[in-house]
Amino acid sequence: VDFLNARARENQWGFVDFNRPMVAINQWEQAADSMYTLCGKDRIHPSTDGHLVMAYLFLKAQGLAGKPVADIRIDGAGKKVTRSDNCRVSDLSVSSDNLTFTYEAKSLPYPIDTSYYDNEKHTQADALSVIPFMDEMNYEGLSVSGLSDGYYGLTIGGEFIGRFTARELERGINMALLQNTPQYKQAMKIRQMNEERWLKE
């Protein structure tokens, strides 16, 4: 790996080391479970969770860690938007029992796959236990401060999404974890089309 990295630097090529971090994850996890592996049945190529780990390492090497899908922060008491990263937030309206706004995202959340393929032992979702993908690359944050104690319903496009406490909303929720949002469903359709294309190749 060091040799390849040196050649890449000499030739001004991009370089990503998949081997060392993936071996390190395997060794760490095997300390608790000797059968753990990010590899597939052939013990060489990555399994479904291993592919997500590789994607994470590749994207991180491109400097994409820490860039949110979106990050919305609203001061409910002050009736103002304090942050709108990678999105547009407009039409904020705050009343005694309601807070509404228009949210236009510039990207979609990544829909984590929980399906098993080709008799694999792991799913893509299993990778989330060994990499901080959701925090670093799949964060669609919504934070609302200044709310009175109690429970609040979140609706998007007229659809009920979930119920959260004022404390949870102040701390911030990751909407990419909510599989019933319109944006998650849209991302699922794109993933399905991509899988159909992949099966035809």
Protein language model features and the residues they cover:
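Active-site-proximal beta-strand/loop segments in catalytic clefts of secreted hydrolases
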Residues: 18-21, 54
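Conserved catalytic region of serine esterases and O-acyltransferases that act on ester linkages
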Residues: 37-201
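Short, flexible, mixed-charge acidic loops at enzyme active sites
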Residues: 26-34
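Solvent-exposed loop/turn segments at secondary-structure junctions
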Residues: 20-24, 44
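Active-site-proximal cofactor/substrate-binding loop regions of enzyme domains
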Residues: 1-19
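Generic secondary-structure signature for well-ordered alpha-helical cores
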Residues: 5, 9-10, 27, 59-67
